[in-house]
């Protein structure tokens, strides 16, 4: 695989990866940090690895050791003030999660118009991109599992685990789960309304992350599911020499 670029999206709970050569995506997958054998099989001395990480220090060290042992070069990407015609209006651009930044870079390449970028993972982010490519800001909301854990630990009776979506739930487990889904979808829908008012036009909506398929059937806005969004952003920055 020498000469290939390895793209690594190191999230809180899993590693998403892709192998790209001359603009062609050869392979991609998702691995738990407990078993990185699928990623290891793609590594070879001379491969360039570009990493966007919000993972814990322990997971980052495990990943770094794997890349070093394989003889790969590693570029750990950071959020910056601008890339191409995307500008990062965060109060301190370096404090924006690099996964969010890569998602915005990819979204701008896909849509030259106002766009809401939703990443539904361990936490859900809902980021607003203006028509001229300015990142206006965004929300961070606990994801489904975090909200469930909070209810179980923070209520006297402990909300029942599991549950299924019901428009009018009639048991505690369903009520808790349906409330979580409604809250997450409401965050997306509210930001969609606010971005439309700001831009004077209904924005596109792109959604990525492991929880996307859970939310999509319940969203009150049209959204395109793009599982590779963060990896696409990494690939664009990698082609530009690793500065994003």
From Swiss-Prot:
<feature type="binding site">
    <location>
        <position position="172"/>
    </location>
    <ligand>
        <name>substrate</name>
    </ligand>
</feature>
<feature type="active site" description="Proton acceptor">
    <location>
        <position position="99"/>
    </location>
</feature>
<feature type="binding site">
    <location>
        <position position="90"/>
    </location>
    <ligand>
        <name>substrate</name>
    </ligand>
</feature>
<keyword id="KW-0418">Kinase</keyword>
<protein>
    <recommendedName>
        <fullName>Type III pantothenate kinase</fullName>
        <ecNumber>2.7.1.33</ecNumber>
    </recommendedName>
</protein>
<dbReference type="GO" id="GO:0005524">
    <property type="term" value="F:ATP binding"/>
</dbReference>
<keyword id="KW-0067">ATP-binding</keyword>
<keyword id="KW-0808">Transferase</keyword>
<keyword id="KW-0547">Nucleotide-binding</keyword>
<dbReference type="GO" id="GO:0015937">
    <property type="term" value="P:coenzyme A biosynthetic process"/>
</dbReference>
<keyword id="KW-0963">Cytoplasm</keyword>
<feature type="binding site">
    <location>
        <begin position="97"/>
        <end position="100"/>
    </location>
    <ligand>
        <name>substrate</name>
    </ligand>
</feature>
<comment type="subunit">
    <text>Homodimer.</text>
</comment>
<keyword id="KW-0173">Coenzyme A biosynthesis</keyword>
<dbReference type="InterPro" id="IPR043129">
    <property type="entry name" value="ATPase_NBD"/>
</dbReference>
<dbReference type="Pfam" id="PF03309">
    <property type="entry name" value="Pan_kinase"/>
</dbReference>
<feature type="binding site">
    <location>
        <position position="122"/>
    </location>
    <ligand>
        <name>ATP</name>
    </ligand>
</feature>
<feature type="binding site">
    <location>
        <begin position="9"/>
        <end position="16"/>
    </location>
    <ligand>
        <name>ATP</name>
    </ligand>
</feature>
<dbReference type="GO" id="GO:0005737">
    <property type="term" value="C:cytoplasm"/>
</dbReference>
<dbReference type="InterPro" id="IPR004619">
    <property type="entry name" value="Type_III_PanK"/>
</dbReference>
<keyword id="KW-0630">Potassium</keyword>
<dbReference type="GO" id="GO:0004594">
    <property type="term" value="F:pantothenate kinase activity"/>
</dbReference>
<comment type="pathway">
    <text>Cofactor biosynthesis; coenzyme A biosynthesis; CoA from (R)-pantothenate: step 1/5.</text>
</comment>
<comment type="function">
    <text>Catalyzes the phosphorylation of pantothenate (Pan), the first step in CoA biosynthesis.</text>
</comment>
<comment type="similarity">
    <text>Belongs to the type III pantothenate kinase family.</text>
</comment>
């Amino acid at each position: 695989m020498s000469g290939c670029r390895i793209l690594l999206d190191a999230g809180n709970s899993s590693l998403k990866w892709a192998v790209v050569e001359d603009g062609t995506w050869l392979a991609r997958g998702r691995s738990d940090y407990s078993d990185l054998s699928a990623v290891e099989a793609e590594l070879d001395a001379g491969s360039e690895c570009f990493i966007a990480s919000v993972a814990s220090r322990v997971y980052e060290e495990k990943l770094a050791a794997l890349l070093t042992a394989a003889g790969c070069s590693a570029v750990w990407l950071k959020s910056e003030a601008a890339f191409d015609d995307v500008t990062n209006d965060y109060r301190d651009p370096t404090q924006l999660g690099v996964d969010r930044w890569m998602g915005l870079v990819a979204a701008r390449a896909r849509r030259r118009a106002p766009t809401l970028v939703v990443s539904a993972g361990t936490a859900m982010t809902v980021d607003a991109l203006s028509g001229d490519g300015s990142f206006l800001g965004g929300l961070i909301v606990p994801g489904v599992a975090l909200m469930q854990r909070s209810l179980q630990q923070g209520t006297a009776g402990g909300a029942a685990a599991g549950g299924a979506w019901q428009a009018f739930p009639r048991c505690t487990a369903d009520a808790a789960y349906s409330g979580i889904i409604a809250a997450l979808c409401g965050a997306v829908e509210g930001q969609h309304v606010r971005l439309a008012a700001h831009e004077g036009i209904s924005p596109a909506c792109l959604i990525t992350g492991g929880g996307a398929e859970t939310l999509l059937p319940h969203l009150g806005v049209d959204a395109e599911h793009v599982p590779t969004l963060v990896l696409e952003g990494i690939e664009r920055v990698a082609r530009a020499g690793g500065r994003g």
